Amino acid sequence: SKVIAKLGGTSKAIGILAGNSGKAIQDALDGEGLAHNFRFVPGETRTNLKVIDPENHTNTDINEPGIEVDAPELTALLYDLLKELKRGDIVVLAGSLPKGAPKDTYYTWVESCKKAGAKVFLDADGELLAEGLKAAPYLVKPNNDELSRMMGRELKTLDELADAGQALIRRGIEHVVVSMGGRGALYLRKDSVIYAPALKVKVGSTVGAGDSVVAA
């Protein structure tokens, strides 16, 4: 939502929060004038720490496990989302799911949003991505490592990544974006493949880079 706003667009953040950490996230969005519709549940939203070592050029992620959210709570959140949707809206489903969430959650959500007339962007990994792909979202944005895991082999060259992306197109996905860090990104659809090299900039942290690609 923050990147979309900086690029001149509008969005609404929808999700599940808990406790003081969740309140801090909500307050931060309010402070930036960003629309949201969160459901609060018992517990505490997890805190993820990113330790950046500028001398060795390394990032260390310390991610807490997070709270458990059951299927009825997720269903209520989905209904909140569907009530907001208008035909032609774009829905971004991104990230991991909380403990307790059914493995086919993204499949269910993609299907439901498509029936409401929305275009769904899916940014996930592993089994969550595999399940979501079964519902043929409008766009998916794996990075090169995620796409390699999906295909069961290491994809090194641009041609290998492009071929794997086209395999997703043949499964009914209209648009595929493959982010490759400092190597740039690939954009694929049925009749074209476009390669965009990365800008040469000093990297402070890569946290949120993939999310920013989706927002753009």
Regions found by a protein language model. Give the residues of each.
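Short, conserved phosphate/pyrophosphate- and ester-handling motifs at nucleotide-, phospho-/glycolipid
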Residues: 4, 143, 210
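Short hydrophobic/aromatic-enriched beta-strand-loop microsegments
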Residues: 11-15, 33-39, 137-148, 195-200
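Conserved phosphate-binding/catalytic loop of the ribokinase/pfkB sugar-kinase fold
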Residues: 50-87
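Substrate-binding N-lobe of the ribokinase-like
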Residues: 1-45
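Conserved beta-alpha-beta core of the PfkB/ribokinase-like small-molecule kinase fold
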Residues: 90-160
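Cofactor-binding loop segments of dinucleotide-utilizing enzymes, especially the Rossmann-like FAD-
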Residues: 16-19, 41, 54, 96, ...
